[in-house]
């Protein structure tokens, strides 16, 4: 437990979702490569005998062995806007020999397949995971895909994970971890943290993901941020309805200790004879030179005043303009999908192409977002430096919502996101003011910024300013505003990110671009953005009178200008 993680392979592919063999000597895992697509591999723990198991390209997920390692199950996933749609027909749960031969589909839907204790059935979960349906179910089929049974149903759960001996089930419900006996009474059982007919116990005061069981079924494991947790379970399943303890002790956490260096380029670069827009007011240097040493600007000024070091690689930029990188603090950069990361993230390239060098995404899938962040910072992905909030602290219905009824609830919600490295959280439509105030208090204690969803509710927006939120995301829906609002905002420290392409209380600014320009012909946009994304939004135009725009995002912009003139910090947010 105190060791240092060591990579087992030398593949250039991205690797994910490892599963130990029952003898503990090898690991199954999936890979993704943007050019050759996905596969399933097997490798010994010493890194030897690497073997590709699948023969057909595809998007493969969560492989698992049976008890004697002679069979495997896995999921073939449908396509998506990041990984594409090639080789994604006949998706579902598959059974195959351990060497990948004789694959057959046993279910058209479901995910997270595993074998039953006697290897005669295959369990799988339906309803998705985060951002899936409100109700998840644990089902099973026989090895021919017949005799479908539904064992558990759980509203607002995220994961349902039976132990290998099928005596227990661990589950995640609204980010919290629980364990219960695996009751088999021939019918579907409703399962949640308030189940009374049999014992359901909490595994931890904190949140967790990647829930799984030890090979001997004596421990439940999970991760949170950079820690790996274990908790012992008492085997009392001779009577699953007995109200005896299931959990033996407090969870034990260890640091994973996987450390990657931030990517810092080597050498010097000189951009010569370039027009430079500086950050000194309105200053523009018409014939300038910029010298970059590794990842920092070393010199900047008029070309005639700068001596270029002999070791610098010189780029002559006559006719070009260099400007400071754009910081987009409300940038949705493709971190919503619950799946494997691509090696070239097109949303990153598209943002870079239009000058965005720093992005902050205020609504994401936590694991996806911080994976992208760390891959970018370590040099495995090209993209803007990225920050994010993790899951929004959602006040409405959803399997990812944050129930906040007291200060401890707020601390729990923020701590689970901060564990991944979040420096901000998004309070999203928490309906009551005291809920938002509890989030603010917890955020102050934990040193995290709070950027709330505006929600097109003027009075909530004003209370957010009174209560000291870091900034308001999206525009306030009332325009123009007068001295009372201007004075309040001026005397606060709350910023404003109006995201003008989405305009509450009027026509969205995005639509004006489609009406007045041929967006689908923009070469820079099309170089990095999939054609279907551009065409579906831009080719079928909505034509509206000009006054709709003037009374929409233009009027909002006039209020933004008035606030900026009063000293309110206005942020760029492209949404």
Label the predicted regions.
Residues 282-323:
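Histidine-rich, glycine-flanked metal-binding segment
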Residues 422-464, 502-503, 550-552:
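Divalent metal-binding pocket/active-site signature
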Residues 320-378, 398-399, 405-408, 434, ...:
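Metal-associated gating/positioning segment near the N- to mid-region
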Residues 347-367, 383-394, 418-430, 440, ...:
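Divalent metal-dependent hydrolysis catalytic cores, especially in the metallo-beta-lactamase
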Residues 413-431, 477-575:
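Active-site neighborhoods of metal-dependent hydrolases
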Residues 152-157, 195-212:
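Conserved blade-ending motifs and adjacent loop-strand segments that build the rim/top face
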Residues 1, 8-15, 22, 30-41, ...:
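A flexible loop/linker signature enriched in serine peptidases of the S9 family
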Residues 197, 230-268:
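Pro/Ala/Gly-rich low-complexity, hydrophilic intrinsically disordered segments
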């Amino acid at each position: 437990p105190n060791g240092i993680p060591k990579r087992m392979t030398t593949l250039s592919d991205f690797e994910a979702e490892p599963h130990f063999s029952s003898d503990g000597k090898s690991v199954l895992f999936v890979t993704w490569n943007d050019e050759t697509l996905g596969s399933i591999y097997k490798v010994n723990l010493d890194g030897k005998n690497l073997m590709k198991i699948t023969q057909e390209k595809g998007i493969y997920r969560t492989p698992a062995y049976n008890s004697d390692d002679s069979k495997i199950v896995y999921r073939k996933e449908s396509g998506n806007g990041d990984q594409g749609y090639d080789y994604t027909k006949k998706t579902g749960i598959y059974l195959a020999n351990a060497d990948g031969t004789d694959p057959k589909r046993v279910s058209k839907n479901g995910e997270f397949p595993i074998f039953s204790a006697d290897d005669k059935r295959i369990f799988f979960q339906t309803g998705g995971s985060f951002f899936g349906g409100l109700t998840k179910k644990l089902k099973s089929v026989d090895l021919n895909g017949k005799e479908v049974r539904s064992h558990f149903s759980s509203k607002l759960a995220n994961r349902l994970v039976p132990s290998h001996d099928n005596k227990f089930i661990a589950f995640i419900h609204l980010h919290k971890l629980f364990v219960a006996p695996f009751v088999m009474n021939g019918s579907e059982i409703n399962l949640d943290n308030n189940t009374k007919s049999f014992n359901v116990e909490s595994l931890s005061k904190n949140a967790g993901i990647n829930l799984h069981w030890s090979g001997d079924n004596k421990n439940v494991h999970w991760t949170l941020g950079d820690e790996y947790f274990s908790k012992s379970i008492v085997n009392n399943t001779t009577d699953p309805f007995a109200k005896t303890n299931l959990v033996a002790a407090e969870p034990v956490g260890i640091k994973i200790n996987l450390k990657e260096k931030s990517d810092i380029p080597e050498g010097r670069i000189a951009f010569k004879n370039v027009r430079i827009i500086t950050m000194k007011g309105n200053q523009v240097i018409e014939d300038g030179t910029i010298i970059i040493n590794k990842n920092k600007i070393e010199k900047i000024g008029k070309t005639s005043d700068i001596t270029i070091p002999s070791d610098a690689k010189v780029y002559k930029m006559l006719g070009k303009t260099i400007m400071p990188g754009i910081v987009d603090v409300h940038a949705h950069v493709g971190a919503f999908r619950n799946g494997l990361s691509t090696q070239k993230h097109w949303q990153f390239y598209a943002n870079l192409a239009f000058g965005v060098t720093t992005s902050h995404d205020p609504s994401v899938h936590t694991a996806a977002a911080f994976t992208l962040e760390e891959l970018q910072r370590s040099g495995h992905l090209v993209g803007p430096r990225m920050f994010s909030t993790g899951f929004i602290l959602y006040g409405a219905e959803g399997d990812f919502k944050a129930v906040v009824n007291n200060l401890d609830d707020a601390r729990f919600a923020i701590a689970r996101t901060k564990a991944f490295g979040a420096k901000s959280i998004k309070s999203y439509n928490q309906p009551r003011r005291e809920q938002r105030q509890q989030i603010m208090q917890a955020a102050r204690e934990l040193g995290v910024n709070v950027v709330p969803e505006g929600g097109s509710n003027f009075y909530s927006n004003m209370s957010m300013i009174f209560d000291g939120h870091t900034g308001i995301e999206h525009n306030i829906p009332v325009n123009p505003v007068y001295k009372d609002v201007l004075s309040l905002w001026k005397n606060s420290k709350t910023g404003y990110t109006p995201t003008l392409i989405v305009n509450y209380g009027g026509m969205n600014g995005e639509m004006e671009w489609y009406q007045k320009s041929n967006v689908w012909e923009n070469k820079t946009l099309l170089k990095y953005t999939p054609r279907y994304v551009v065409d579906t939004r831009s080719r079928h135009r909505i034509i509206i009178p000009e006054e709709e725009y003037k009374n929409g995002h233009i009027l909002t912009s006039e209020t933004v200008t008035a606030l900026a003139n009063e000293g309110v910090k206005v942020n760029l947010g492209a949404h």
